[in-house]
């Protein structure tokens, strides 16, 4: 049990990369990454640890100069000075040179530098911000991970306490080359595995005493309203709670289905599977297995030393391999055989066990993940963050946040900054979990954030007033929620490819802006803005709409380039900061010129778990671009053997030529034929011709003037065919400023004559700057000048 078939461990560093004395050992991993050890007994550790699994990197060129009891070590990216003896800030330092950091960076042992932050164990009871643990990225150019106190893994994959004391740290000296640092962190600690496809759809979760009938009715209502969900999460009321005899303690921990609510659990879960939903079930395991549990006799028999006559409880001893193997075999596996797909490990009881330094949360995450993969399926866990290396066990559960605007405002930054410690698949309680207050716009903006987050899981408490069903909100709010939940599933082809990219290229779905633009000071100040895969820059709305304007204000930085709004089709010039104003129907999602985004309309039920027959490809004009669509079986670990299908797409903007190349690879994994619609966004209307390899492809074209979208529909075509679409005269559209401003003013709750006066200013034959000056002089309602100015100056 607990075999690791997902990662390769090579924990022993190369001898030729090692500098060793009686009490010290330095191991070069890359020209920028070095392991530093010091032990008085001279016994150094070569086994994998809870954090570090691989130390066998490529050979590194270096030179060394002996200096008394120490030495100076040089690579082309760093200079280490060690005076000998125990590590102190006076005896050990490192100077990072080269790379993207023009002035170098000095690190002294024990100093933390200007760390950019990592993530936190949980957002439980957080209202707004919380303190983050450190990540690997630092504006000072150097950072460290301290592995001195983590446990090691023996040859059987079980944890062992290190013997003796010592220092075991890894220093990252990458300057501001954050992408390279993150890549080597994953090489050191293990890759982020791919998620199964269903995990990227919408999750429904609520702490609520559902019954089989009420849950089926809920799912049926979702289907009727055409609201797609791919995961159903059952909180703790699936098991006996209030029914537990007080002599056994509370019902917080439980493993026995409440037959009053779910008379036939297997029937219920089969029904959910038939309706395209996977099932995750909540566990609070700390209370152990008590005599009232159905699994108690089998567990007691397996362990063999339980006083069942006196109903002795079986303590939850995560430090015992015998207990843990029995726990999975006797308690969890029978429920998985009934239909549970993965477990929600809701551990809230701290980090203390019988073994010093052993965090039970890490143990739960590690062994749950390995066990979930035992039959060759792609595993999944759902649990809190347990320190560096936790990215190996997706998905992260961030805990019970408070329902406030302050909590929403913190989550974009919290999510993107977690990439600084490689933790790339956070799942938040979208809409907030508890307390707080009712605010319909807040609920909507949270859903919009969720759709452009790693995982989109709606969740709330038992409070009868806190339901997240879209029909619980006013129609204008609920309908937009539905649109966004559908959009999440429409984006699954793009998201699944980004899922593969995270695994293959060590690049998380969400990155802070300073990863791509490390030399830009402003990239460090737009904390709620992030890159969302290869195509988008996202700046979620986290403030209430400006009264009177009817739109919410969000501060956005656009790097150099051209951008096209995902929702409105407006074209923007980059290399500037600006305030953007969005009504309830959208948030700032800016596609980069040349971006290619595969989407689908096959989004309901079991459609979400398979590769679609009908594809919509969004192509954003203004620059060349390329995309490689990744597809596989969506649920096994065959991706580790590169069993997949790749479909290349590319745009040559100057000639208007867009090509969908032949699909290549395991073609039996995708439909034999596909129907394509290619949408060119941000373009003027023009002719479009279609060529299909040996198929005589015919196509239809239509143009949406309001969105600047030219759609070319190609009928059913073999997946092995090449499709070439050529635009007659490719050119970016000119924004229809007058119509956009009219639509803004038409909905604004301001005096009618003020609206007329603003439109008159727009009609004047004067510069945009002069128009804004005259508009400001009118002293209109707050936000009107900014909202009009955004449209007026979108293209500079």
Locate the predicted segments by residue.
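A low-complexity, Ser/Thr/Gly/Pro-enriched, surface-exposed linker/loop concept
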Residues: 4, 29-68
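Short, well-ordered beta-strand segments enriched in hydrophobic/aromatic residues
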Residues: 26, 34-36, 73-80, 537-540, ...
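Solvent-exposed beta-strand/loop surfaces of large extracellular or lumenal domains
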Residues: 47-61, 564-584, 688-713
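Glycine/proline-rich low-complexity spacer/linker segments in large multi-domain proteins
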Residues: 51, 82-114, 601-609, 730-772
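Catalytic and substrate-binding clefts that recognize carbohydrates or anionic sugar/phosphate headgroups
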Residues: 63-199, 206-207, 212, 219-224, ...
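Aromatic- and carboxylate-enriched substrate-binding clefts and catalytic-loop regions
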Residues: 103, 107-109, 228-481, 516-518, ...
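A conserved hydrophobic secondary-structure block that centers on an alpha-helix together
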Residues: 125, 195, 199, 205-242, ...
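Catalytic core of carbohydrate-active enzymes
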Residues: 369, 389-396, 410-414, 418-428, ...
């Amino acid at each position: 049990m607990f075999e690791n078939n997902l990662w390769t461990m090579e924990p022993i560093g190369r001898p030729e990369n090692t500098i060793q004395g009686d009490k010290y050992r330095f191991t070069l991993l890359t020209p920028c990454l070095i392991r530093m050890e010091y032990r008085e007994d001279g016994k150094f550790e070569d086994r994998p640890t809870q954090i570090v699994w691989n130390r066998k990197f490529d050979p590194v060129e270096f030179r060394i100069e002996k200096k008394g009891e120490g030495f100076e070590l040089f690579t082309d990216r760093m200079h280490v000075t060690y005076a000998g003896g125990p590590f102190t800030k006076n005896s050990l330092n490192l100077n990072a040179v080269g790379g993207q950091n023009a002035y170098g960076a000095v690190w002294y042992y024990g100093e933390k530098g200007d760390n950019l932050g990592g993530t936190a164990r949980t957002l439980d009871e957080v209202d707004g911000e919380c303190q983050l643990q450190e990540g690997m990225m630092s504006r000072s150019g150097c950072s460290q991970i301290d592995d001195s106190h983590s446990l090691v893994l023996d040859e059987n994959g079980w944890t062992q306490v290190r013997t003796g004391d010592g220092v075991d740290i890894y220093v990252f000296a990458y300057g501001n080359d954050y992408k390279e640092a993150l890549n080597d962190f994953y090489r050191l600690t293990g890759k982020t595995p791919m998620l199964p496809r269903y995990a990227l759809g919408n999750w429904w979760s609520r702490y609520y005493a559902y019954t089989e009938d009420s849950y089926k009715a809920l799912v049926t209502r979702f289907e009727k309203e055409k609201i797609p969900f791919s995961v159903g999460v059952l909180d703790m009321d699936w098991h006996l709670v209030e029914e537990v005899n007080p002599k056994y303690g509370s019902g917080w921990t439980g493993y026995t289905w409440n037959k009053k609510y779910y008379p036939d659990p297997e029937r219920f879960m089969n029904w959910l599977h038939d309706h395209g939903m996977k099932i995750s079930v909540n566990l609070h395991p700390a209370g152990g297995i008590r005599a009232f549990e159905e699994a108690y006799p089998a567990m007691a028999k397996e362990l063999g030393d339980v006083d069942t006559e006196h109903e002795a409880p079986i303590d939850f001893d995560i430090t015992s391999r015998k207990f843990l193997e029995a726990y999975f075999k006797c308690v969890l596996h029978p429920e998985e055989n009934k239909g549970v797909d993965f477990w929600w490990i809701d551990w809230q009881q701290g980090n203390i066990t019988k073994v010093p330094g052993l965090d039970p949360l890490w143990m739960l995450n590690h062994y749950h993940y390995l066990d979930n993969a035992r039959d060759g399926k792609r595993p999944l866990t759902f649990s809190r963050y347990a320190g560096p290396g936790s990215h190996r066990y997706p998905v992260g559960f961030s805990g019970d946040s408070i329902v406030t605007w302050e909590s929403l405002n913190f989550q974009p930054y919290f999510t993107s900054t977690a990439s600084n410690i490689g933790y790339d698949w956070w799942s938040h309680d979208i809409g907030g979990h508890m307390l707080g207050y009712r605010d319909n716009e807040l609920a909507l903006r949270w859903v919009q954030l969720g759709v452009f987050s790693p995982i989109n899981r709606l969740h709330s408490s038992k409070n009868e007033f806190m339901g997240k069903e879209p029909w619980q909100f006013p129609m204008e709010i609920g309908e937009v929620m539905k649109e966004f939940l559908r959009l999440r599933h429409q984006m699954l082809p793009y998201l699944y490819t980004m899922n593969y990219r995270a695994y293959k290229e060590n690049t998380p779905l969400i990155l802070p802006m300073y990863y791509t633009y490390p030399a830009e000071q402003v990239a460090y100040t737009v904390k709620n803005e992030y890159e969302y895969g290869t195509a988008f820059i996202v700046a979620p709305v986290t403030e209430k709409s400006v009264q009177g304007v009817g739109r919410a204000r969000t501060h956005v930085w656009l790097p150099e380039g051209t951008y096209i709004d995902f929702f409105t089709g407006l074209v923007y010039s980059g290399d500037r900061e600006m305030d953007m104003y969005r009504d309830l129907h959208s948030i700032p999602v800016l596609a980069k010129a040349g971006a290619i985004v595969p989407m689908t309309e096959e989004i309901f039920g079991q459609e979400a778990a398979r590769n679609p027959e009908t594809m919509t490809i969004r192509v954003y004009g203004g620059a060349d671009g390329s995309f490689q669509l990744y597809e596989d079986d969506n649920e096994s670990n065959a991706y580790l053997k590169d069993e997949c299908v790749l479909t290349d797409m590319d745009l040559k903007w100057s000639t208007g030529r867009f090509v969908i190349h032949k699909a290549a690879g395991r073609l039996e994994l995708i439909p034999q034929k596909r129907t394509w619609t290619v949408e060119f966004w941000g373009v003027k209307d023009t002719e479009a011709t279609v060529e299909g390899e040996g198929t005589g492809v015919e196509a239809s074209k239509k143009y949406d003037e309001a969105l600047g979208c030219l759609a070319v529909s190609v009928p059913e075509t073999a997946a092995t065919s090449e499709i070439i679409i050529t635009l007659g005269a490719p050119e970016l559209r000119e924004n229809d400023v007058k119509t956009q401003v009219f639509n803004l003013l038409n909905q604004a709750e301001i005096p009618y004559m003020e609206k007329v006066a603003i439109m008159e200013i727009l009609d004047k034959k004067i510069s945009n700057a002069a128009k804004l000056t005259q508009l400001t002089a009118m002293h209109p309602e707050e936000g009107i000048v900014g909202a009009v100015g955004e449209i007026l100056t979108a293209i500079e």
